[in-house]
Amino acid sequence: MKKILSLMLVLILLVGALVGCAYSSKAGEDPVVTAKNWIETQIKKNTLFSFDYAGKEYTEHIKSWEKTVEEKENFWVVTYTNGDVVAWSEITLDDEMAAVEWTNYFKNNGSVDSPVISDIQAIDSVVQVENPVLTSAQGSNSLANDFQPFSIDLNVEESFKMASMGGRSSHGAFPYFDICNGEYGIIGGIGWTGNWQAVFSAQDSNVRIQAGMQQTQIALHAGEQMRTPMVMLQFFKGDQDAGHNAFRQLVLKSYTPSDASGEPIKKAMMSIGVSSVAGYGIDELLNQVAFFEAINIQYDSLWIDAGWYGDIKGDNLNTGVWREQVGNWYFIPEAYPDGNARELGDYLASQDKEFVLWFEPERAVYGTKLTVEHPEWFISDEDNPKQEFMLYNLAIDEACDYLIDMIGTIIKDSKVTWYRQDANFEPESRWKTADKAEGENRVGITEIKYITNEYRFLDGLVEMNPGLMIDSCASGGRRLDLEMMKRTIPLWNSDYTTHPDTATADGNRALCYNLTWWLPIHAGGGANVTAWDTIYRFRAAMMSGMQINIDSTKLGVVRNTLIEQYYTCRDFMTGDYYILQQGFDKEIDTKDACYEFYMADQGKGYLMAFRPENCKTESNSYRLKGLDATATYELEVADTGDKLTMTGEQLMTDGLKVTYPRANLSLLIYINKI
């Protein structure tokens, strides 16, 4: 009997070692306490991350490493040493937001290659959530269901895997998730702008989370160092909306860049854009700015998109051949005779306007200036070395330094205040080509060096141009991971709207409002959805930032009214947010929708309600959330001035009845606590 009990104890301990150790949280516990206890448990049990070493699995080899723990206030460095190889984690606890963030590193201090480090999981840990339901979202695929949430009951599915594709972090999958049960839970994010994968496995009330790069099998060279993706977990109590609103505030605090004043950005912009038209030279642009002033249109920035650069002359100025010129990063001489846009930048600055300028530095056309001058800095397709598009190899430090100086100088000379970075290219296959050139046991090293230098490049531009703000586009919303969010604001959240034959206002509305559930600051597209000719289309894209094209400024009185409403509503977009009703997939264009933004500390906010063109619903009651049940609220329809008074309890219990006199109608309703 004693032998049986001993065997059972060994099995229990073995299972615990294999799956990590979960701190047992409770529904009513302070999330900060849960977060701190959880991270201390992972440090103690060596269950924060994992990797195979010299052919041995993590649980077989980790106990042979020498371990040290350095702890300061809410910061830990956990170091493992095995001969000349060092692995360590740098961990931070935000004790206001109940959030834990860490990044893992490896270094070979020896004089020869290290043993192979493989299957690196940036997180390999267990969290305890009873009856766990996993929720994430679709990635950016240029579809109406971009960022549409989906849920997996882990008690039923037991295991679920998701992964990005092509080498861009939110293409095909979304690097954020929550695991909750209606009473408490965690919300997490991955900080890696390349390929990643995550696996969620449940057993009883434990959920094992494994996430990292998709492929790693690396022998580090002498003196070489590498990092893993960053991981963040935020603990919360309450329902799923409580978790998402806590996460939105965390993003605003810790994963949003600062503006020129040094303060975290709280909004995007109303931008007027010149899109893919090379013929707009300096004189034409100055004339356009004068036109905006003449018609008294309110806006924040002038946006010059692709097409201002390269060898374009004469009759070709207006052809918009922007793809053919990437790699020729100099202003079109005929359109910009001074070689820069300084006159425009100076004028916009004098009017307190921002200047957005587009680049795509990671891709170049074979034969352009940069590929000719530095062919050693480009990765071609393995089977077609002279393929049209080549990848600029940021993994090379010298190439990264050169790019910082070249683009940083263009920005400085033209007084650009927003650097808009596109990336219309899937780098994955080129990374693999470069890995093969490195020799054996170097799988994943190019991606690691490339992404590490991607961050160094962006940080270098800001260091060279203090106050510079950055937009990450990547074919519209395909680089939305936490590391990129630290540095950028997505001003174009999806390329869905660049397909006018298939895109609809409601498809645009769905992807914009779904992304807002996770990320509070981004800009809705819409410039190419037929026209900005209706109130409905405008409100469908009304996020923290918006873009309208020059032709869209000719909207008469409605234009100024809509823009005034946008500026009023924008102030509430960093508050609490609730999706009260909407349709998914085929129902996007047939089901009514209602969204709520509310600033609890101000007692103010608004509802945005939509009845799509193909929706038969003539009225519906929407139950509001997050209000003070004991307070009285005044609700005002923005377009008519009609007002209604109700208590918070009535609004949250019975709901607000909204009547739609017709289809293709949107209603903006202001909320004011009185």
Locations of regions flagged by a protein language model:
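Polysaccharide-binding surfaces and accessory modules of carbohydrate-active proteins
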Residues: G28-S205, Q214-T216, T632-T640
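Active-site-proximal substrate-binding groove within the catalytic cores of carbohydrate-active enzymes
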Residues: N453-L644, V658-Y660, L665-L667
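Positively charged n-region of N-terminal signal peptides that target proteins for export
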Residues: M1-L7
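Active-site and adjacent substrate-binding regions of carbohydrate-active enzymes
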Residues: N104-F106, L348-S350, E398-L482, I489-P490, ...
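Short Pro-Gly-centered flexible turn/kink motifs
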Residues: I218-K237, N664-N672
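Aromatic-lined carbohydrate-binding/catalytic grooves of carbohydrate-active enzymes
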Residues: K267-D405, W418, E428, D435
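Sec-dependent signal peptide cleavage junction
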Residues: A17-E29
